[in-house]
Amino acid sequence: EMCIRDRIYQRLDGLNNEDRFGVQAVVNEKGEVEGINEKLLIGAADISLNDLLSRVHEYNGIAIAAHIDRESFSVLSQLGFIEKGTPFDALEVTPFTGLTQARIVYPELDNYSFITSSDAHYLKDIGTALTKIMMEKPTLAELKMAFARQNGRRVLEQ
C-alpha cells in the first residue's frame, strides 16, 4: 500500500538544486543523516487542498495548517483565505501572534481550534512555544477530540 508521502511525491515535479535550495538531508531521530532527498520539496504538488486533507484523514492523521499568520509559506499567504468547511483539524499561528490575538485577527476562522508551536527549524528552537490542551490521556484520538471541542476536551487558549 502506498503511503501519503509516496502519493505526494508522485505529484512533485523536478529535482532539488542544492546550490540554489540547499541540501535536503534525511535525518533520523538521533540526528544522524541517513541520506539525501533528491526531490524538489520546495515546489508545489499537483494535488488539491481538499484532496490532500482527505488523504491525511484516510491515514488517521491530523491536518493542521502551519503558521497561517506568516506572510509566506502558509495556506493564507498562498490562497488568501480558508474556505468554510475546509477539513483542517486545527490552525497553527506563530508565537508572535499567539492564540488570543489569532481569535481577534481571524474571526472568520472561529470554528477552528488554534494552536501555537515553536515551528522549529533549528534544534535550539524546539520547545520555545507550546499549546496546552485539555485531554484525558495523550493519544491521537484525544487530540482529535480536543481540536473538535468534544466531550470536554479542548485547546486552552489562555
Regions found by a protein language model. Give the residues of each.
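Extended substrate/RNA-proximal surfaces in nucleic-acid metabolism proteins
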Residues: 1-90, 97, 107, 142
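Glycine-enriched alpha-helix->loop->beta-strand junction motifs that scaffold or abut catalytic
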Residues: 85-90, 109-113, 130-134
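Histidine/acidic-residue-rich catalytic or RNA/ligand-binding cores of hydrolases
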Residues: 73-81, 103, 124-137
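Mid-to-C-terminal alpha-helical segments outside catalytic/metal-binding sites
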Residues: 137-158
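Short, aromatic/basic amphipathic alpha-helical patches
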Residues: 103-109
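Active-site metal-binding loops of divalent metal-dependent hydrolases
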Residues: 68, 95, 118-120
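Short acidic/histidine-rich active-site segments
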Residues: 112-128
